């Protein structure tokens, strides 16, 4: 007997991803930042997170799997704790790409780029800028007095909510992608949706380039005397 965790969530539309696959993605999101580097930042961590699910989606299509793995090695940078949300949406779009020859695969990276900025803004401010500071404050105030509860409370206050958030993001990201994108495609609005995502993605990458890339030239433009 097949358990609910082994039943494809979007089976009615030909999907193959199960809840067990998403739970596995959740666990594989934990080392997201282990391979961070300046060129593409978290792209290898993102690939590691969704890799097994991609192999399942393109099980009988080696060339499609190769393209999907290459496609998802593009630049990626987002608060690690909410990255499974983007991973879930990406898997939903990869399933659509696998089933529909007319689907524009480049839109997958456009949607990823469009989501990185807004989710990072929320994640950095709430998780790293608020929850982490709160956990450090409580933990440190006890630790300086020699109370063993200091590091324990820091560990629990910061990690329990973020673990739950990662899990919820993995599940809800895929469900949103599977349900919403199928409806958008059926309504004929997919092209407009992808155009909007591409424009937003270019804006996000442009803003990040402005912040991260520094170029100096010998040419100086003066004003006045």
Where are these regions (language model features)?
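The structured alpha-helical core of multi-pass membrane proteins
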Residues: 76, 125-129, 159
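Transmembrane alpha-helical segments and their cytosolic interface motifs
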Residues: 106-141
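Hydrophobic, membrane-facing alpha-helical anchors
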Residues: 101-115, 213-224
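Membrane-embedded alpha-helical modules
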Residues: 130-134, 141-225
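Cytosolic juxtamembrane amphipathic/interface segments immediately preceding
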Residues: 28-33, 70-75, 107-120, 182-187
């Amino acid at each position: 007997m097949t358990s609910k965790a082994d039943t494809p969530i979007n089976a009615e539309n030909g999907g193959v991803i199960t809840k067990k696959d998403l739970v596995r993605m959740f666990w594989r999101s934990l080392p997201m930042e282990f391979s961070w580097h300046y060129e593409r930042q978290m792209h290898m961590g993102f690939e590691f997170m969704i890799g097994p699910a991609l192999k399942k989606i393109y099980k009988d299509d080696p060339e499609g799997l190769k393209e999907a793995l290459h496609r998802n090695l593009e630049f990626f940078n987002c608060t690690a704790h909410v990255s499974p949300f983007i991973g879930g949406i990406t898997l939903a779009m990869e399933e659509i790409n696998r089933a529909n020859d007319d689907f524009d695969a480049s839109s997958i990276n456009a949607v990823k780029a469009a989501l990185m900025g807004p989710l990072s803004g929320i994640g950095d401010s709430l998780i790293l800028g608020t929850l982490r500071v709160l956990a450090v404050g409580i933990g440190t105030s006890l630790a300086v007095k020699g109370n063993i509860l200091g590091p324990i409370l820091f560990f629990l206050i910061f990690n329990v909510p973020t673990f739950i958030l990662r899990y919820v993001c993995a599940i809800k990201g895929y469900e949103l992608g599977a349900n919403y994108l199928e409806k958008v495609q059926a309504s004929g609005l997919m092209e407009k949706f992808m155009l909007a995502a591409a424009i937003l993605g270019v804006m996000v990458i442009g803003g990040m380039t402005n912040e991260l890339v520094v170029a100096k030239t010998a040419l100086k433009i003066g004003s006045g005397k």
